[in-house]
Design a protein with these regions (language model features):
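Short acidic-glycine loop/turn motifs at beta-strand connectors
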Residues: 53-56, 131-134
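Structural signature of tandem-repeat unit edges
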Residues: 3-17, 27-49, 57-74, 82-96, ...
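Consensus positions within tandem repeat domains that build extended binding/scaffold surfaces
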Residues: 21-22, 77-79, 99-101, 155-157, ...
Length: 281
């Protein structure tokens, strides 16, 4: 949408269908969303400044002042997309959060979850949303501390939001999902532990300032994992590395030298496409 002059909106009673995703994306001046009380399909209950679908109590569209009330059951695809929210509180009632719910929300710096929520948790000081058993980190933000005990970092968990210069993934983490740290331009160095068993495709793509990667786990680097990391110049790979996927280092314009362990028996021909790599030992 991107209507920067839009300051309020009222959804009339005759509206029966609203498209997927946040219809108010990047409407940064919009502080008020109201749905007519006589609308049979949608409401803005509890003055939440959002649009909720009545049939399943799913929040589908928001603005910068939207609050998630304890009468909302689900956060839909891209429902907060492009908003400038800083704080997220997940109440007890929410049982479903789309992995795309907070796409484009790069200014989040505080996350909490109600202790009574049966699906999600947020350990004190973590500023993250985790699965109830604490093993999967589903959503992080600029100030997240990855708790000990986390075994998986979900798809798009930190997309564009991680703000620390050194990313040190804790031991015990076994998997990093697709796009998990994509477009996190603050990251300068990434240290990936021996415990890793899988890195999803595109996991670090477009991290513009990522310069150093230390991979300690003998795994396969997935397709496009470090694609478009224009500053990447130093990559440390362990003995036992199994392979390097399609365009794993695509367009890494600063990568001139890399030492590939003899154990890596499967390296896709275009793994280093558009890289100035002149030496691959």
């Amino acid at each position: 949408c991107g209507c920067n002059s839009l300051t309020s909106i009222v959804i009339p009673k005759n509206v029966t269908k609203i498209g997927n995703g946040n219809i108010f994306t990047y409407c940064n001046s919009l502080p008020s969303i109201i749905v007519d009380n006589d609308n049979q399909n949608f409401d803005s209950r509890s003055n939440c400044n959002g649009i909720i679908r009545k049939s399943d109590s799913e929040l589908i569209a928001t603005c910068r002042t939207t609050t998630i009330g304890n009468d909302i059951n689900a956060l839909g695809d891209y429902c907060f997309d492009g908003t400038t929210i800083h704080f997220i509180h997940i109440p007890e009632s929410v049982v479903e959060i789309s992995e795309y719910a907070f796409g484009g929300c790069n200014e989040i710096d505080k996350i909490t979850v109600a202790p009574g929520n049966q699906k999600y948790t947020s350990p004190k000081g973590s500023n993250a949303i985790l699965s109830k058993d604490g093993k999967t980190l589903l959503l992080g933000c600029r100030t997240t501390v990855i708790p000990e005990g986390v075994e998986a970092i979900g798809d798009r968990a930190f997309f564009g939001r991680y703000s620390k210069t050194v990313l040190r993934i804790p031991e015990n983490v076994k998997s990093i999902g697709m796009d998990a740290f994509a477009r996190c331009n603050a990251i300068f160095e990434a240290i990936l532990p021996k415990s890793l068993q899988e890195i999803g495709g595109f996991a670090f793509q477009n991290c513009a300032n990522l310069s150093v990667v230390q991979l300690l786990a003998p795994i396969t680097i997935s397709d496009y994992t470090f694609a478009y990391c224009y500053s990447l110049s130093t990559v440390s790979l362990p003995e036992g590395l199994e392979g390097i996927g399609c365009r794993a280092f695509y367009d890494c314009k600063s990568l001139k030298h890399i030492t590939i362990p003899s154990s890596a028996i499967k390296i896709e021909k275009n793994a280093f496409e558009n890289c100035p790599v002149s030496e691959k030992e």
